[in-house]
Amino acid sequence: MSLKPYATPTYWQRVKVAFQYIFPQLPVTRLAGWLAEQKWGAVTHFIIRTFAKQYKVNLSEAQKSNASDYATFNEFFIRPLKENARPINQDAQALCLPADGKVSESGKIEDDRLLQAKGHFFTLETLLANDQEMANKFKDGHFITTYLSPRDYHRVHMPCDATLRKMIYVPGELFSVNPFLAEHVPNLFARNERVICEFETEFGPMVQILVGATITASMSTVWAGIINPPRTKEVVEYHYETSGETAVHLKKGQEMGAFRLGSTVINLFPKDSVEFEAHLQAGVETRMGERLAKIK
C-alpha cells in the first residue's frame, strides 16, 4: 500500500468539499433517476449523443452503437457490450478485473485498515456495516478500489468463479466518489450507500462491494434485481444457500451487477490468498476481464 504525502487543500478545494455536505444528495439523486427513465424520443437521443461526445464514450463497442437505439438514458448507461469486447483472462490461476475504470487505491489491508486516498484510511468493520465476523476474514488481506467514471462501461463482473453467501444493503450518504473527494472526505466509502456481496471461492471468502454516489439512482445484482430504490433506513441482510437449486453460482467474467450512474467497486481478499499484478497502482486504467491477480 503506497502512502502519498497529504497536501493541504486550497481555499476553493475546501469550498468544493463543503458543498458536498450541504448539497441535497437524495432529492437530486431521485430526480436524476426519474429523468434517466423517461422516454422522450429525440430529446433523449440528443442527451445521449451530447453525453457520449462530452465524455468520449466509445459506442462502437456497445451492442447498440447508435444513440437513437436507446429508449432511455438508463438503457444507454448500462449498455451491454458486443461479444468479445472484453476478453476474459483464461488462466485458471488468475483473477480478472471486475470493471472498467481506474484504480483508486490498492494494496495490503494493514490489520483492519484500508487506504482510501492520500492520508485517509477507513476500517474493514465500518466498511462492512459493523459485521465483525466478516471483517475478521480479511484482516491483513488485500483490497482494490476501482472508480468508474461517467464514460465507463457500468456493468460489474466476477473476478473468479464464486458462490454467493450473503448480501448486505447499507443505507448511507451519497457523496460523489471521484478521486478528488476521495482525498478530502474522511471515511467516504464507509459512509456512502452500498451493497456488500460475500462469496465463497476456491481460495476462501471474497467480498465485492458496489458503492453508491450522488445521482447513482440505483444499484442492481443479477440474482436480486434492483436493490435500491426503495431506500431503507436500516441495514438489510440477505443470506443464501451455497448448494442446491437455489444457490447462486457465478463464473469468472460473468456479470454480477450494475450501476445506474456512478460509481465505485471495492474487492476484498483474505490474507495470503492472492498476489496482485504489480502495475495496478492508483490512477491506472482498468478494463474488465484483464488480469487482476494470481491465486497463491
UniProtKB/Swiss-Prot annotation:
Cofactor requirement: pyruvate
Active site, UniProt feature: D100 (charge relay system), H157 (charge relay system), S263 (charge relay system), S263 (schiff-base intermediate with substrate)
Record PTM text: Is synthesized initially as an inactive proenzyme. Formation of the active enzyme involves a self-maturation process in which the active site pyruvoyl group is generated from an internal serine residue via an autocatalytic post-translational modification. Two non-identical subunits are generated from the proenzyme in this reaction, and the pyruvate is formed at the N-terminus of the alpha chain, which is derived from the carboxyl end of the proenzyme.
Annotated Pfam families: PS_Dcarbxylase (PF02666)
Lipid bilayer topology: Peripheral membrane protein
Compartments, as annotated in UniProt: Cell membrane
Domain of life: Bacteria
Cofactor note as given: Binds 1 pyruvoyl group covalently per subunit.
Keyword match Lyase: yes
Pathway: Phospholipid metabolism; phosphatidylethanolamine biosynthesis; phosphatidylethanolamine from CDP-diacylglycerol: step 2/2
Cellular component GO terms, alphabetical: plasma membrane
PTM sites of type Pyruvic acid (Ser): S263
Entry's Gene Ontology BP terms: phosphatidylethanolamine biosynthetic process
GO molecular function: phosphatidylserine decarboxylase activity
Main localization (coarse): membrane
Catalytic activity annotation: a 1,2-diacyl-sn-glycero-3-phospho-L-serine + H(+) = a 1,2-diacyl-sn-glycero-3-phosphoethanolamine + CO2
EC number: 4.1.1.65
Family note: Belongs to the phosphatidylserine decarboxylase family. PSD-B subfamily. Prokaryotic type I sub-subfamily.
Quaternary structure note: Heterodimer of a large membrane-associated beta subunit and a small pyruvoyl-containing alpha subunit.
Function: Catalyzes the formation of phosphatidylethanolamine (PtdEtn) from phosphatidylserine (PtdSer).
Record-given protein name: Phosphatidylserine decarboxylase proenzyme
Organism per entry: Actinobacillus pleuropneumoniae serotype 3 (strain JL03)
Gene: psd
